[in-house]
């Protein structure tokens, strides 16, 4: 059962849990994703955040963090939570893929319950997605930062890292767009906005941008995806047009990558 809770109250609560566990090792909690970019839908979005620490954390602390999130799972949005714990030094001195201490998400809950050592261990871990998450955190939004201001913690992420972080997921949309049209349509739009105009946009705002900057023959497809994203509607989509849109978007993206000689 999901208990509806004001999202800002939940953010404050998450921060308090983390501070209590980390004590002097706490730097801050930084929310990213659709919430930071202004298109959060509690029925379709998860709560994304990065926990930053001064020093490495041991397995006992890792388990305390995971157990606290599970203990309060019912307070999170329907899609749950996704978080990573990262050393402050790895937020300032960025290398790609970015190392992390701990990861947690709804997709990892069952494996955590079955065998904690799969999730909690001393292995060296890296995540290419963190470059994209850090880039979103660099979009100013003081309401999303708890602890030290994000501008004092996170360095600017090189564009080639951000592109590499998103590129394979974007390519997958060619095959996945029929099964997951809303996500793929809007993700292709916002990634093209990033590649072409260096814009960091939410999925919804990526759709708005595409209505003015991409082939208008697909405006109805994009509008349907935007409507479905922010509401409980389920528009129907023509599979052939979906695939054509994906192929055209990928072609535009690749042209920009090649023109700017961006490593992918």
Swiss-Prot record:
Q: Does the keyword Transferase apply?
A: yes
Q: Give the knockout phenotype.
A: No change in spectinomycin or streptomycin resistance.
Q: What is its EC number?
A: 2.7.7.-
Q: Which GO terms describe its molecular function?
A: nucleotidyltransferase activity
Q: Keyword annotations for this protein?
A: Plasmid, Transferase
Keyword Nuclease carried by entry? no
Q: Which InterPro entries match?
A: AadA_C, NT_sf, Polymerase_NTP_transf_dom
Listed Pfam families: AadA_C (PF13427), NTP_transf_2 (PF01909)
Write out the function statement from the record.
Probably a nucleotidyltransferase, it does not confer spectinomycin or streptomyin resistance in situ or in E.coli.
Tell me what this protein is called: Probable nucleotidyltransferase
Organism field: Campylobacter jejuni
């Amino acid at each position: 059962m999901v208990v509806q809770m004001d999202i800002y109250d939940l953010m404050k609560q998450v921060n308090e849990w983390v501070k209590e566990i980390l004590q002097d090792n706490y730097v801050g909690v930084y929310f990213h994703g659709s919430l930071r970019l202004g298109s959060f839908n509690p029925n379709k979005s998860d709560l994304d955040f990065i926990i930053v620490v001064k020093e490495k954390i041991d397995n006992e602390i890792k388990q305390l963090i995971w157990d606290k999130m599970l203990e309060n799972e019912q307070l999170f949005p329907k899609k749950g939570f996704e978080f990573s714990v990262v050393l402050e030094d790895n937020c300032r001195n960025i290398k790609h893929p970015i190392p992390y201490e701990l990861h947690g998400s709804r997709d990892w809950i069952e494996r955590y319950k079955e065998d904690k050592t799969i999730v909690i261990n001393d292995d060296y871990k890296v995540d290419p997605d963190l470059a994209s998450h850090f880039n979103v955190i660099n979009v100013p939004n003081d309401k999303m930062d708890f602890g030290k201001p994000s501008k004092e913690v996170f360095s600017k992420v090189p564009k080639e890292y951000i592109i590499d972080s998103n590129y394979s997921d974007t390519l997958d949309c060619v095959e996945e767009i029929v099964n997951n049209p809303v996500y793929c349509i809007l993700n292709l739009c916002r990634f093209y906005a990033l590649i072409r105009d260096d814009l960091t946009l939410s999925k919804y705002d990526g759709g708005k941008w595409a209505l003015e900057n991409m082939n208008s023959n697909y405006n109805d497809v994009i509008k349907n995806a935007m409507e479905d994203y922010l509401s409980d509607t389920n528009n129907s989509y023509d599979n052939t047009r979906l695939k054509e849109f994906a192929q055209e978007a990928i072609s535009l993206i690749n042209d920009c990558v090649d023109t700017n000689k961006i490593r992918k």
